[in-house]
Regions:
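Bacterial N-terminal signal peptides
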Residues: 9-20
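Sec/Tat signal peptide C-region and signal peptidase I cleavage site
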Residues: 21-25
Length: 303
C-alpha cells in the first residue's frame, strides 16, 4: 500500500504537466482583424523599420481581404512599407506557441461617409439600404463597399480555414485607424462610424455564433494632431463612441510622429502606434505579449 501511494505521488506532477499541455493544445486560435485607411495599411518605409521585423514570423497566418475574398491565409513578409499591425504581430508571435490569424482590410484615402473622396473610390459606409445596392470591393470585380470586403472576407476565412481548425478559433478584436478622409463632414462621422461598428459586430457574430462577438472589442487609434488632415471633431466622435458603446476603446495617438507629408506615420511613429495598440490588447486580456514602450530608434537608424 505504501509503495502504491509513493508511485501515485511521483506520477502526480507528470499528470498535471500532461493535462496543462493538453489544455494549451485545445485553446482556440486567436484571430485579429485590422482595418482602416492608409495608416492602417502601412506607409512607413521598411528602411526605417525596427530591426526585429526583419526576423519574420513563425506563427502568423495572414489574409488581406481587400484585394480578394477567397478565405485563404498565407505567410506574411514585409514589402517596401510596414504598418503598426506588423509590430503588434511581431510581439504576439514572439510569445505564441501555436498559429494565430490576422484578417486585414485597409485602403488608403478612404472615408466612411459617402462623397468624401474621388468618385469610384470604395468607402466604409454601412447603411443597410446602400449595402444592399453595392458589392464588396476587390481587385477583380471593383465594388464600392469596404465594409462588405471585410465582413465577407472574414466569412470566407472562417468557412475555408478557421472553421476547420481542430482547436476552434476566437476573434479577439478589431484594430482600427481611420478618420482623415472624413474630415470635411465630421458631423456625420459619429453616426456613420457607430453604424459600421455595429454592422461588423453583427456580421462576425453571424459567422461565429458566439454571444461575446456582439460586443467584439474595437480598438480605435486617434489621428495625430500634427496631421494636416486632423479634425478635432473626428477625434471627439471617436472618444464619444469609446464612452457610449460597449467594448470600444480609444488609443491616444495625438503625439505620434509623421513623415514629411505631415499625414502618414514615420518609422518611429509606426512602431509607437504598434506598441500602444499591443498595450491595449494586453490590458484587455486579448493578447499574451509584451514590448518595451520605448521606440527602437537606434535599430531604425542602423537598418
Amino acid at each position: 500500500m505504501q509503495r502504491t501511494n509513493v508511485i501515485r505521488l511521483l506520477l502526480m506532477p507528470i499528470a498535471f504537466a500532461l493535462s496543462a499541455t493538453m489544455a494549451s493544445a485545445q485553446k482556440p486560435a486567436s484571430v485579429f482583424i485590422v482595418a482602416g485607411q492608409s495608416n492602417a495599411e502601412g506607409r512607413a518605409s521598411t528602411k526605417e523599420c525596427p530591426h526585429y521585423l526583419a526576423k519574420g514570423y513563425k506563427h502568423l497566418k495572414y489574409a488581406f481581404v481587400r484585394t480578394e475574398q477567397n478565405g485563404r491565409f498565407g505567410h506574411f513578409s514585409l514589402g517596401k512599407t510596414f504598418a503598426f499591425c506588423d509590430v503588434v504581430n511581431h510581439f504576439i508571435d514572439q510569445k505564441a506557441t501555436t498559429d494565430f490569424y490576422v484578417v486585414k482590410c485597409a485602403f488608403g484615402g478612404t472615408a466612411i461617409t459617402p462623397a468624401q473622396t474621388e468618385a469610384g473610390k470604395p468607402i466604409w459606409y454601412a447603411d443597410s439600404t446602400w449595402l444592399a445596392q453595392n458589392k464588396p470591393h476587390n481587385s477583380t470585380n471593383g465594388g464600392m463597399s469596404l465594409a462588405l470586403s471585410l465582413t465577407q472576407g472574414f466569412e470566407k476565412c472562417a468557412e475555408k480555414t478557421l472553421s476547420k481548425l481542430k482547436e476552434g478559433y476566437d476573434v479577439k478584436a478589431v484594430l482600427w485607424h481611420q478618420g482623415e478622409s472624413d474630415r470635411s463632414k465630421p458631423q456625420q462621422y459619429y453616426d456613420n462610424f457607430k453604424q459600421l461598428i455595429n454592422f461588423v459586430r453583427k456580421e462576425v457574430y453571424a459567422v461565429t455564433g458566439k454571444e461575446k462577438d456582439k460586443r467584439l472589442p474595437f480598438i480605435i487609434g486617434t489621428v495625430p494632431r500634427a496631421s494636416r488632415q486632423y479634425n478635432p471633431m473626428i477625434e471627439e466622435a471617436q472618444r464619444k463612441l469609446g464612452k457610449e458603446l460597449p467594448n470600444v476603446h480609444v488609443v491616444d495617438l495625438s503625439d505620434v510622429s509623421l513623415q514629411a507629408d505631415v499625414l502618414h506615420f514615420d518609422g518611429k511613429g509606426t512602431e509607437v502606434v504598434g506598441k500602444r495598440m499591443l498595450e491595449k490588447l494586453v490590458e484587455l486580456g486579448l493578447a499574451d505579449a509584451s514590448a518595451d514602450a520605448t521606440p527602437n530608434t537606434k535599430a531604425c537608424e542602423a537598418r
